[in-house]
């Protein structure tokens, strides 16, 4: 059995994060599927890597992804979702067509949907966000109607958080998870090697007028080689500092705040630390970073971080993070360094998180190539 791997794909300011669990299941947290990379285009071809190297399981003749989580419906977190996914049809009653298969549309086993998050963004949803919501509503209807195919691959759904607008009557409690809940099931199966702790969205709004104050925030704890919770991963979309403050206030068991792999929220924006980049960081944000265990890593899913006025990414935020990494910038990774887009890959082992620098692949390429080493894409 292989170890769990986490890949942060380079999509400039945006998120496309793939987790390949040790039991063979896969989860994608957000997506930004740009146009396929061409020879004259430096954009990394995420879809090609997913379809060629990652999603090797097939269901109904389509590449199969066990779960897709949309932290919030901003376009840089769901771009290309509609074009690349098998949607709006029950795969049990409407078999994928030859065109669907030729297009290699991704069949998503289970959709993780937060009605509360969508409520805060409903005035300006993109077409991709609308497609996601429509698909979520299709799946919810199957559960409400107790359809015999509701728990089949491509029809499953997990509701994250509370809802002010969607009627959840008929959807079993086991498919609904609120802040403070731990999830040990994914895509219809009990998962014994990893678990998800939901921190946000909250039942009640928090003070502030930013749309980035509603987002799915979760901790994923992963076992490895007999070591329980060897990996402690945190994903929070674009959640700003008030969210992280409230998470700490609401969390009684401090193990649910620990991390050794943390994705810098909002593409390394300073909003994790404060509203204004010229302000001192909020004490609560610094306190959260103190929950690091072992040699933890922080990842910025963003364009190259420069000393300019961009926010995101923000050089000042990066500096704050590095200070909390014992001033060791080797533990801060960005998906684009010096304008070069490179997936950032980690592996969970019994003693924690390991950065995959691609050394094994480099060695294999060096041995197999008579004309020198090819450009290496994985770190």
Each language-model region and where it sits:
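Short, solvent-exposed loop/turn and secondary-structure capping segments
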Residues: 17-20, 29-30, 39-41, 79-82, ...
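Active-site metal-binding motif and surrounding structural segment of the metallo-beta-lactamase
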Residues: 27, 38-111, 253-274, 298
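Long, structured stretches of catalytic cores involved in phosphate-ester chemistry, encompassing
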Residues: 242-337
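Flexible, acidic/histidine-containing loops and adjacent segments that form or flank the divalent-metal
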Residues: 1-4, 60-67, 78-234, 239, ...
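Flexible loop/turn segments at secondary-structure boundaries
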Residues: 14-15, 36, 76-77, 120-121, ...
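Short, flexible/disordered intra-domain loops and linkers
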Residues: 35-45, 121-132, 271-281, 306-313
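Conserved beta-strand hairpin/beta-sheet module of binuclear metal-dependent hydrolase folds
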Residues: 1-63, 214-239
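Active-site metal-binding loops of divalent metal-dependent hydrolases
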Residues: 30-34, 73, 116, 201-203, ...
């Amino acid at each position: 059995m292989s170890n769990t791997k986490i890949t942060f794909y380079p999509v400039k300011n945006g998120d496309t994060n793939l987790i390949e669990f040790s039991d063979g299941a896969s989860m994608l947290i957000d997506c930004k599927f740009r146009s396929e990379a061409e020879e004259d285009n430096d954009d990394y071809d995420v879809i090609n890597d997913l379809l060629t190297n990652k999603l090797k399981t097939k269901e109904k003749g389509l590449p199969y992804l066990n779960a897709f989580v949309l932290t919030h419906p901003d376009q840089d977190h769901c771009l290309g979702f509609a074009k690349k996914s098998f949607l709006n049809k029950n795969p049990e009653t409407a078999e994928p067509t030859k065109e669907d298969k030729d297009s290699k549309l991704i069949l998503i086993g289970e959709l993780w949907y937060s009605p509360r998050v969508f409520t805060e963004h409903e005035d300006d949803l993109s077409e991709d966000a609308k497609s996601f919501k429509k698909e979520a509503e299709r799946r919810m209807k199957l559960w409400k109607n107790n359809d015999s195919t509701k728990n089949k691959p491509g029809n499953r759904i997990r509701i994250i958080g509370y809802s002010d607008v969607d009627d959840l009557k008929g959807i079993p409690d086991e498919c609904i998870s609120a802040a403070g809940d731990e999830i040990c099931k994914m895509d219809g199966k009990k998962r014994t090697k990893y678990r998800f702790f939901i921190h946000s969205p909250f039942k009640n709004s928090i003070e502030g007028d930013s749309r980035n104050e509603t987002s799915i925030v979760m901790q994923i704890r992963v076992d490895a080689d007999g070591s329980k919770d060897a990996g402690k991963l945190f994903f929070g979309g674009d959640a700003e500092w008030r969210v992280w403050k409230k998470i700490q206030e609401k969390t009684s068991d401090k193990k649910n705040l620990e991390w050794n792999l943390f994705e810098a929220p909002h593409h390394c924006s300073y909003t994790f630390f404060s509203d204004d980049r010229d302000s001192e960081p909020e004490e609560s944000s610094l306190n959260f970073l103190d929950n690091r265990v072992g040699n933890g890593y922080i990842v910025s899913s963003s364009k190259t971080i420069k000393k300019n006025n961009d926010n995101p990414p923000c050089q000042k935020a990066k500096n704050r993070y590095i200070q909390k990494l014992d001033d060791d910038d080797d533990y801060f990774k960005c998906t684009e360094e010096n304008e070069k887009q490179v997936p950032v890959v980690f592996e969970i082992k019994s003693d924690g998180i390991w950065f995959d620098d691609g050394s094994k692949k480099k060695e294999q390429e060096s041995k197999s190539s008579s004309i020198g080493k090819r450009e290496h894409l994985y770190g």
